[in-house]
């Protein structure tokens, strides 16, 4: 295994883990990072999807006690309500993804659309933060099915790379009456079925690019994603306990503008093919 490939896998794994659960778009960052590292062929695209498993497992580990309790208490009203809400929120993006993902990947999975989505998403976060929030659900257990559906519809925006799945669901949650912590935690829980389904579906469709010789590359990226995602989740929950999402909005806007400016100035040759 080429050491340069392993280094790229390590860097992309760290990028995936640090950005997956923050409202800054992991897909957008991976597309841009892959372009800079010249790691954007078909095998690389499967790799960036597969290493999401590391990030998913980080959520499962961080909330393992809660997940075990839900499984043990299936059949009770509270546990059933939580599972049903997750299923309701999962459906909109799953349906739209199956219908339009090929078209979206063909036209939008490139640096320039990502940069535009980063800036647009940042502006929307600033707008959402300036709205008055009426909290109707302090915890995920207080959520109604209607709020779950609304968050699920908001998640559909994340099909556009650069938008951010966590950003769309968290900000959507705030707009629809969830507390900051409830919005963030529901976003984390919702990531489990969404990312598992998307990862296995995409990897299965591109299984011809999977080889035993690449096991080291996939393992390196997945472990890096797991560790960095665990750090990001814990830090993010602590941060939003005392702050809003304005910092992430300005980061998105700044990063997106840098990509656009470097592209149009010719300083960086972002690929568009």
From Swiss-Prot:
EC annotation from Swiss-Prot or TrEMBL: 3.6.1.27
Domain of life: Bacteria
Cellular component terms per the entry's GO annotation: plasma membrane
Enzyme class, first EC level, given as a word: hydrolase
Protein name: Undecaprenyl-diphosphatase
Biological process, per Gene Ontology: cell wall organization; peptidoglycan biosynthetic process; regulation of cell shape; response to antibiotic
One of the record's GO molecular function terms: undecaprenyl-diphosphatase activity
Signal peptide limits: none
Keywords from the named record: Antibiotic resistance, Cell inner membrane, Cell membrane, Cell shape, Cell wall biogenesis/degradation, Hydrolase, Membrane, Peptidoglycan synthesis, Transmembrane, Transmembrane helix
One Pfam family named in its UniProt record: BacA
Family: Belongs to the UppP family.
Topology term for the membrane: Multi-pass membrane protein
Transmembrane parts of this sequence: 4-24, 43-63, 82-102, 108-128, 183-203, 217-237, 248-268
Cell compartment(s), UniProt: Cell inner membrane
Native source organism of the sequence: Nitrosomonas europaea (strain ATCC 19718 / CIP 103999 / KCTC 2705 / NBRC 14298)
Protein encoded by which gene: uppP
Record function comment: Catalyzes the dephosphorylation of undecaprenyl diphosphate (UPP). Confers resistance to bacitracin.
Catalytic activity: di-trans,octa-cis-undecaprenyl diphosphate + H2O = di-trans,octa-cis-undecaprenyl phosphate + phosphate + H(+)
Misc. remarks from the entry: Bacitracin is thought to be involved in the inhibition of peptidoglycan synthesis by sequestering undecaprenyl diphosphate, thereby reducing the pool of lipid carrier available.
